[in-house]
């Protein structure tokens, strides 16, 4: 639980793409700052930190900004085990869901003609954890409109390889740039 409320940079990149989609392996798909938080009902929440408005914690306006900038909940996990102040959650199904946080956004899906995700045709390739980061590789398949690319035209499906890199950010962030 030492990582609760710690900011984590989640970067998603393509590891493989079908031909003629205009997307290539290694390209950035998505990037967000996320954090884990315990909910009052005992669930573990994964939230996206929206860095839209900000004030110094000692400023009077800070409370107004805080209550007017609710960070969205990306996922809620049941805590499976709690021992020695460490929470254990199952994340496998989360990585196989179709969510914007860990995959293509709506515009990218439209460009590639992606429709419904096919969980039966998707899998987790690997999960590797290191002291400061975790790498998750998935292969996901979507139903696709046939006019967008060769894979969709031939099969009605598009398969993409994705890598999600979670990097723990420093607990004391760098100071903001005051001007350029």
Cite the ranges covered by each PLM segment.
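Auxiliary tRNA-acceptor-end handling modules of aminoacyl-tRNA synthetases
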Residues: 1-180
């Amino acid at each position: 639980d030492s990582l609760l409320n710690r900011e984590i940079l989640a970067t998603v990149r393509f590891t493989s793409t079908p031909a003629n989609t205009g997307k290539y392996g290694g390209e950035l798909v998505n990037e967000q700052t996320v954090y884990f938080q315990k909910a009052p009902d005992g669930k573990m929440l994964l939230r996206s930190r929206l860095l839209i408005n900000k004030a110094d914690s000692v400023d009077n306006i800070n409370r107004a900004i805080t209550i007017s900038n609710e960070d969205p909940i990306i996922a809620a996990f049941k805590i499976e085990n709690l021992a020695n102040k460490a929470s254990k959650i199952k994340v496998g199904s989360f990585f196989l869901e179709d969510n914007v946080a860990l995959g293509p956004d709506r515009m990218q899906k439209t460009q590639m003609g992606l429709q419904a995700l096919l969980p039966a045709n998707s899998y987790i390739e690997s999960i590797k954890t290191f002291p400061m980061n975790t790498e998750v590789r998935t292969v996901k398949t979507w139903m696709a409109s046939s006019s967008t690319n060769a894979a969709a035209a031939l099969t009605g499906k598009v398969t993409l390889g994705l890598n999600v890199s979670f990097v723990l950010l420093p607990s004391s962030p760098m100071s903001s740039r005051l001007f350029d």
